[in-house]
Amino acid sequence: MSILSTRWFSEQEIEENSIIQQFHMNSIVGEVQEAQYIFPHSFTTNNDPSYDDLIEMKPPKILETTYISPSSHLPPNSKPHHIHRHSSSRILSFEDYGSNDMEHEYSPTYLNSIFSPKLEAQVQPHQKSDEFNRKGTKRAQPFSRNQSNAQDHIIAERKRREKLTQRFVALSALVPGLKKMDKASVLGDALKHIKYLQERVGELEEQKKERRLESMVLVKKSKLILDDNNQSFSSSCEDGFSDLDLPEIEVRFSDEDVLIKILCEKQKGHLAKIMAEIEKLHILITNSSVLNFGPTLDITIIAKKESDFDMTLMDVVKSLRSALSNFI
């Protein structure tokens, strides 16, 4: 009885080991088939030798064993014999791997590493297209910069043309006798006008060098002209002085109004001294004007007689000449 039970347990252990090994192989084959479904182009039996290795590792189908009662088939004096498996069953038998080793060996990461060359071949075109797109975006930045620079140049050119047009308009207003308003005509007439002005300036400078002081009212002798109520007296050098040494004095009376014109050399302080000498003669100055004429001063004075004024034209001229001769 103990022999039968021992044999039954040994056969039971063999069956359990074979069932466990078949379960592991079925799970491995299932994972391989699942990976083949995910990557259909990567699994080919002709190109990848690792696929054949997986097929060879599949164990042969284990035949089912039936239990035969020893009392019915064995002779009474015979001993039970152990059932020997085929040698291939011992070659394809697997050792007891841990669950972690099995999961690591046939995990999706491990399978991906096996089929990585083909996967890289499939992924590389997409990566290249992505890199090309990224490069395209980088190349678009200089194009946008060039476009903005072109717009800035266009705006600057417009402003420059506006300023140029405004200056042409201002130049056309300065040129006399302008008939046409186009730019070429404006520039041509402006050049002609500038040349004319330059020639005119040269002529005036030559006249200034050759100019001599000429007195328009020079009398060799004193004379008195009486014309109704209007009296006039002009005085010039009659004592041998040159025309430039003594001033020219002209005095006119019209009732209470007095007109005095003096032409003298231009020196500092002459105008104030002349005004002071006129006021000493009891003449009230109401208006005066001074003009520069070369190296001389042309002084014109309008005045009125005061109540205590009692002088003749000759007395006024002589008094002014004697006073001016002291400081001129």
From Swiss-Prot:
Keywords: DNA-binding, Nucleus, Transcription, Transcription regulation. Induction: By ethylene (ACC) and jasmonic acid (JA) treatments. One of its GO terms (molecular function) is transcription cis-regulatory region binding. InterPro entries: bHLH_dom, bHLH_transcription_regulator, HLH_DNA-bd_sf. The keyword Kinase does not apply. One of its GO terms (biological process) is regulation of DNA-templated transcription. Residues 148-197 form the bHLH domain. CDD domains: bHLH_AtNAI1_like. Residues 125-152 are annotated as: Disordered. It is found in: Nucleus. It comes from the Eukaryota. One of its GO terms (cellular component) is nucleus. Coiled coil: none annotated. SUPFAM superfamilies: HLH, helix-loop-helix DNA-binding domain. Expressed in flowers. PROSITE patterns: BHLH. Its main location: nucleus. Pfam families: HLH. Homodimer. This is Transcription factor bHLH25. It comes from Arabidopsis thaliana. The lineage of its organism: Eukaryota, Viridiplantae, Streptophyta, Embryophyta, Tracheophyta.
